[in-house]
Amino acid sequence: MSREIRSVVTGTVYQIEVTVGEQVKLGTDLIILESMKMEIPIVAETDGTVIEVRFNECDSVIEGQVLLMVDPD
C-alpha cells in the first residue's frame, strides 16, 4: 500500500529532490519546502519507490497536503 508524504507546514516547494520511479531509503530528502525564509526538508519515512509527485518547484502548499506518494519496499 502506498504511503502519502504530507506537508508539515504551509509554504512553497523550494526544491524537489526525487523523480517518479526513483528508489529511496529511510531518511532520504524528498522535497525541500520553504516557509518564513526557512528551508524544511521532507524525508522518506521508509525505504521504497516514488510513484507520484504532486507538485512542482515554486508551487504553494498548505499544511497537511499530500506532496508525493511512496510505495514501501
What do the predicted segments below correspond to?
Residues 1-12, 32-45, 72:
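Short beta-strand-turn/beta-hairpin segments enriched in glycine/proline and small hydrophobics
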